[in-house]
Amino acid sequence: MQIQSFYHSASLKTQEAFKSLQKTLYNGMQILSGQGKAPAKAPDARPEIIVLREPGATWGNYLQHQKTSNHSLHNLYNLRRDLLTVGATVLGKQDPVLTSMANQMELAKVKADRPATKQEEAAAKALKKNLIELIAARTQQQDGLPAKEAHRFAAVAFRDAQDKQLNNQPWQTIKNTLTHNGHHYTNTQLPAAEMKIGAKDIFPSAYEGKGVCSWDTKNIHHANNLWMSTVSVHEDGKDKTLFCGIRHGVLSPYHEKDPLLRQVGAENKAKEVLTAALFSKPELLNKALAGEAVSLKLVSVGLLTASNIFGKEGTMVEDQMRAWQSLTQPGKMIHLKIRNKDGDLQTVKIKPDVAAFNVGVNELALKLGFGLKASDSYNAEALYQLLGNDLRPEARPGGWVGEWLAQYPDNYEVVNTLARQIKDIWKNNQHHKDGGEPYKLAQRLAMLAHEIDAVPAWNCKSGKDRTGMMDSEIKREIISLHQTHMLSAPGSLPDSGGQKIFQKVLLNSGNPGDSEPNTGGAGNKVMKNLSPEVLNLSYQKRVGDENIWQSVKGISSLITS
């Protein structure tokens, strides 16, 4: 079928959308014959935004009159390439419109990166919608479906194909090093697929080098976006772990309509988080594999907005809390299957004890107050577990923290200070406002968990944006503590030295790379500009550098679920 004949049969709206896409052709270039698949990946782009400012510098007359965006052309190119691959999966590699688009992209590819134009940005943002419209038009042609039904089918088909593409790509360890004041810190993000004792990953349903992306929202077998995150420092000729925790997506498979399957799925995901938590404690894992029943303390910090006014995160929080409650009844022993060093499944016995928090950290929670009351009903119980029943700031800590301090450990002062800070935040409801530090309570809960030898775990809905920012805030404070031997006051903006640490962490924590296997594009949606300005969180002030803020934001604003 020729492209022109397709336009005669497609809707006017679809015609106009694809005419706009085809304007990316460069004049005088011929379209090469191709197989309708996406072109090769663009060369890697530098992490910083590059803007030419020298009088003689130019990208050609075409770009001289174009407004540039803050997005790398290579990143946009690779996003469009991945979307075309999904389209080819649904429509087949011989589709003439896909062939045309792929060839145009190949011709337009440039070796040197540059900021994209606003027109290129708009084309990238519209591509997914246009591909779904193309699939719908093809479905109408072939099956005679009504337009609305064809569009619904197309959206589901594209989503399923995209999930499979993202899940089936290699999920690999991300490791970056940063240097500050002569100290070398290594940030490591280890995906579930690489949590191994032997040649295979430890999970009974093996990941086989792959993963479960944040968009796979009906998956009832695996946790979404499950990683172990660590930061270590090289001292005295060896690496010392400063922090280790587990990050993941919400436990609720929230697009599963059957309530029983949704609950089973949430519990399966929770078991995988517990398995990952056990893996993060090698000595405890070895005891469990030797047949000993082991106790495992975990501090779970949800970052969702516990309200259904916008979205359904309130229901997701309920599903997650129900899963933790089901697995952690007092005195309950649970059996997990773990693949040992020989690759055989082995049953281990653990007694899990979970302090389950939820702390809203987005604009809906901190600027509009959504979900705060519901979250605090969970948080009060979890604080009793962690700190004892007397939550007055001046009271001696009880609970897990009291048990730890009774041993007079080397980190006594750090633990005592974190406990006091958390109590102050709770007493004054500081976690209900941005106050210059959106993650003030969540970040300190995770740090305190690590300091008392419990396992910190944290998650938002997807396990990438809010979860990634929490990861960066933890590592910022951990490195700052290692450098200054002092903890930051709650609700304080970083000073210039703290901003330098934060900037380095944001660019070298592995979080931007973690977003790519989940969505096909690197970037964090926490970085946004809302109108009116009063709705914005304090991240521009916390980061202190517009270029780095934009770099961390990446192409997240162009990606739609």
Curated annotation (Swiss-Prot):
Gene3D superfamilies: Cell division control protein 42 homolog. Keywords: Hydrolase, Secreted, Virulence. GO terms for cellular component: extracellular region. Coiled coil: none annotated. Converts phosphatidylinositol 3,4,5-trisphosphate (PtdIns 3,4,5-P3) to PtdIns 3-P and prevents the transition of PtdIns 3-P to PtdIns 3,5-P2. It is one of the known effectors injected by Salmonella into the host cell and is required for invasion and for an efficient generation and maintenance of Salmonella-containing vacuole (SVC). Alteration of the phosphoinositide composition of the plasma membrane causes membrane ruffling and actin cytoskeleton rearrangements. Belongs to the phosphatase IpgD/SopB family. This is Inositol phosphate phosphatase SopB.
